[in-house]
Each structure stands twice: as structure tokens, then as C-alpha cells.
Amino acid sequence: MRITAISAAAALMVLSVSSSLMAQRPDDQIDPRSLALLQEGRTAKAAGNLDGAQDALESALAVDPRNREAFLVLADIARTRGLPGKAIRFYGEALALEPNDLGALRGQGEALVAKGATAKAKENLAKIKTACGGECNDATLLAASIAKGPPVTATAQVEPAKPAPAKP
């Protein structure tokens, strides 16, 4: 009797584990709804509708958070809006999914340069050179961005106060 109960429990466990594994998709298979939203976001971005593009891309990531391309387009939108910190985060999410994505490494490096973190950008350049076996287009573009340096930003300059004339 005891063996029958244990056997039944083991069979039930094997059945439930195997059926749950069959329902999962492989990592490289992105949900088609997410891909459709990605395309919608790209179209909106090309039309200049950055808010609509961002909404569609965020929806694509809600449907399937493994959509690396959606992170890359969101990072490009953030850079277009002058938000390099946000772009760095999106590129980091894409790199978490695929650490050797040359476009993400270059984009993150350029965003790091925009923030003034050239040392980190040089680390990305070294990773790109290692991944592509020397010089490649992404390495050349990032090296040029590093050589150019961070963009000059306008700051509010306050002229020193003139001393008040002395009263006799």
C-alpha cells in the first residue's frame, strides 16, 4: 500500500514537470505579439512620434521581456531625447540578454561618453574589439566617439557681482 501511494505521487510529479517544460518557449523565440509591437514602435519612431514609439516598445517588453531589440530601440529614443543615463540602462538590459551584442556595446559606450564616463566606454571598446577579433565598424565608431569626448553642455554662468561704489 505504501509503495502504491509513493509511486502515484512520483508519477504525478513527473507528469506535471514534463508538461510544464513542454509549454515553455526557447530563449531565442520571441512572442509574435511582442515582435508586432516592436515593428509598430519602429514605425512610430521613424515618423517622429517618440512618445507613441516608447509606448509600443514598452508594451512589447511587457508581452515578452526577452525582446532585446525593443531595449535597443528604447535606448536610441532615450539618446535622441538627451537622456544618456536612461539609454545606458536600456543598453544594459539588452546586454544582460546577449552580452556580445556589438550594437548594444557601442551604443552603451557612446552613451557613457555623453555622461563623461570615458573609462567605462573604453572597457566597452575593448569588449567590442575582442568580440569582433580586432577592428570593425562598431569599434571604429566608438573609438571616434571616445576621441571626440563628451559634448559640451551649456551651463548658467553667473558674472561676479560688481562691488558697490563707495559712498563718501
PLM region descriptions:
Residues A60, E93-A94, K127-I128:
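Canonical positions in the second alpha-helix
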Residues V63, L97, T130-G134:
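Structural marker of alpha-solenoid helical repeat scaffolds
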